[in-house]
Amino acid sequence: MRISFLSLVLTLAYGFGAAADVTRLAITSPEKITMKEDLGKDNPKWKFVAGRWVRRASGGREVLAQTAETQPWAVAILEDRKFDDLDATVRFRPISGKEDASGGLIFRAKDGRNYLLVRANALESNFRLYTTVNGKRSTIASAHVIEPTLGLWHKIRVVAKGQRIQAYLNEALLLDHEEKTFRGGWVGLWTKADSVTEFADLEVIGTPAK
């Protein structure tokens, strides 16, 4: 398992946040565009690769929920715009799960078996960045965190610029890693095992893939 040295330094030295002198990535290209996705509305460009994804009411609004409890992991890819560099955010609410209670943000996806992933888990005290290549998932960066609370909303953010990737949980920069497996692609959503998770407010600012 190849873990980013800088991710380890951030975790050990700064607990649950990054150092003040770590440069935050930003998408500044004049070619950048913004894509906001209302997850409570039907969109035929979603490809639900695995799991059971349903739109339902939650807290007075419509959300997209993954409700299957038997999948190894559930994957949904938004086959709309492809992005190279991006700043993507999504809110997730872990509802239940005994084996896993996770929510993840997929980016630079080629398809439902090849992508980068940042995920948090309400049952584990870690926040991780993965590659998934031909369906095989590998951890490439990890940080120690306080587990996201079941039943509450949390936010994942990932900023990818060239080979450098920074990932945030609830506004705290926790991962800073370089990875060249995938250069551009779609975004999507992810859960694992028996996780029942709701998602809302997916937004991407990025440069269209060339």
Language-model features and meaning:
Residues 20-50, 200, 210:
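Extracellular carbohydrate-recognition regions
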Residues 38-72:
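Extracellular glycan-recognition surfaces and repeat-rich motifs
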Residues 68-133:
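Secretory/extracellular carbohydrate-interaction modules
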Residues 74-81, 142-148, 177, 189:
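Beta-strand-rich interaction surfaces with strong enrichment in secreted/lumenal proteins
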Residues 88-90, 151-167:
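Short tryptophan-centered beta-strand motifs in secreted/extracellular beta-sheet-rich domains
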Residues 105, 181-197:
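Predominantly extracellular/luminal carbohydrate-interaction, adhesion, and secreted-enzyme modules
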Residues 134-155:
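Short, aromatic/His-centered strand-loop micro-motif at the edge of beta-sheets
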Residues 168-188:
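Short, solvent-exposed beta-strand-to-loop segments that form ligand-recognition rims
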